[in-house]
Every structure is written in structure tokens, then in C-alpha cells.
Amino acid sequence: FHYDGERAVGKAAQKFNTMFGVSALSTVSVEEISSLINTPKMFQFYFHKDRGLNDAVMERVKAAKFDVMALTVDTITGGNRERDLRTGFTSPPKLTLSSLLSFASKPMWGINYLTKGKFELPHLQDHVSEGTDIATSIGNYFSTMLDQSMSWKDAEKLCSQWGGHFALKG
């Protein structure tokens, strides 16, 4: 993750007058994105088991005046994320011997890790441990936190609740 990831991509989208998308698993809040970026914005919504979390995220995105809600429908199972398993990727990142060696070979990574803002998942941090300092694999997150029983009725309800442009994202 680049410390300025979503901000930089959003500014590039604005510069080229194109739509910008941000995920529920982004490291920058929808409120900050909305205040920084003046271009059409899409939010990638993950359907969680915790309906309170779903409602809270929906309200934040609506209040931030995003233009499109895209419901992610292909992550209700974690999948075999071989690269993540091989590299030991977790969210938030944790220091291991392997990651320390990577940092040593790329000194700016280490400098940015130590000097830039703390890695957070602002849309989740008040609801699930995966938004805190507890490291988890992305596959584990998808398998345990997302609602594997999501149905067309759930999608229809979200679309109605959103009340604006709505898309399904595979």
C-alpha cells in the first residue's frame, strides 16, 4: 500500500476528468475523499454479515455525496489468494523477517512506513477487528466477515436504500 494511494489516484482521476472508485477497504475515508476530489466518485461496497456495519457504511457514502454505489458480488468466498499466502500479506501489514528484508532492499518503503500516517481501514475500524491493529489475511477477512448468503433480495434492498446509480461489480 502506498501511503498516498487513494488520494493520488483520485487526484489523477480529477486531472483527467474521469470517474474515481474507492473501496470499503480503502485506507482513506469517503469523507476525506469527498473533500479532496471533485470528480464523479464510485464506492465499492462489500456486503458484510454485520448489518449495522452495512448501514453505517451506506450512510457515510450517501453523506459524502458519492455518485455511484457498486456492490461487489464476487468476494462472498475468500478464494485462493496464492500470492497473498506466499507473501504473508495481511491487513494491516505486519513486520516479519521477509517484510524486513523487503524493506531493507527498498529503503523508502521503510522510511514511509515509519514516517507517514498509520495504516487504517476507516470504514471498518469501529465495527470489526480487521479495521484495527489485529492482522488478518484478506482471504480470511472475505471468508469470515462477508455474508456468503447474500442474495438478489439483498442487492435489491441495497439498491433501493442507495437511491442513486447502482452497479454490480464482479
Mark where each language-model region is.
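Active-site entrance/lid segments in N-terminal catalytic domains of soluble metabolic enzymes
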Residues: 1-170
